[in-house]
Regions:
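Conserved SAM/SAH cofactor-binding pocket of Class I
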Residues: 1-42, 48-53
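Short alpha-helix immediately C-terminal to the canonical SAM-binding loop
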Residues: 1-2, 71, 75
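SAM/dcSAM-binding transferase cores
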Residues: 76-136
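Helix-to-beta-strand junctions that scaffold the AdoMet/dcAdoMet cofactor pocket
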Residues: 57-59
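Conserved beta-strand segments of alpha/beta enzyme cores
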Residues: 14-16, 62, 88-91
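Residue-level signal for inorganic ion chemistry
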Residues: 4, 67, 114
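Short glycine-/small-residue-rich Rossmann-like dinucleotide-binding loops
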Residues: 42-43, 118
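Short strand-turn motif at the edge of the Rossmann-like AdoMet-binding core
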Residues: 22, 43, 66-70
Length: 136
């Protein structure tokens, strides 16, 4: 959080940083369905990321997940899980990452933008062990 705190201060962003496990924070009334946007990197399959992130997003907000080249197929495969969690089908945007000095070309990523159109059912997010064992 130190880096994020410094970055937000330097950019003069009016944000609140919260350090919590997503599966716990997503059940807290003070955090549940309170945020306009939640983001995630490609650290898990989309149904898992959606279960962690969509409970934080209020209706009318968005969940944005960064994925690799297979992002479009992953979005299609996860549509049922996303809908169960209150999300609309993902809109897929292709972006190019800046070229680092040690690379010759920019890398492509997919931003999966999921609009929150309904409340996430109270059963979600489930405990992390159950999410890992039985993804939606």
């Amino acid at each position: 959080l130190v880096f994020l705190r410094e970055l937000c201060a330097a950019l003069e962003l009016p944000v609140t940083l919260i350090h919590a496990r997503a599966e716990e924070g997503g059940r807290q009334p003070a955090l549940r369905e309170q945020f306009d946007v939640a983001t995630a990197r490609a650290v898990a399959a989309l149904p898992v990321l959606a279960e962690y992130c969509l409970p934080f997003v209020k209706q009318g907000g968005r969940f944005i997940a960064m994925k690799g080249p297979e992002g479009e197929a992953e979005a299609a495969a996860a549509a049922k899980a996303v809908a169960r969690l209150g999300g609309a089908p993902a809109k897929v945007h292709t972006v190019l990452l800046p070229v680092p000095p040690d690379r010759e070309a920019a890398e492509e990523r997919r931003l999966l933008v999921i609009d929150k159109i309904a409340a996430t059912p109270p059963a979600y997010p489930r405990p992390s062990a159950k999410i890992a064992r039985q993804p939606l």
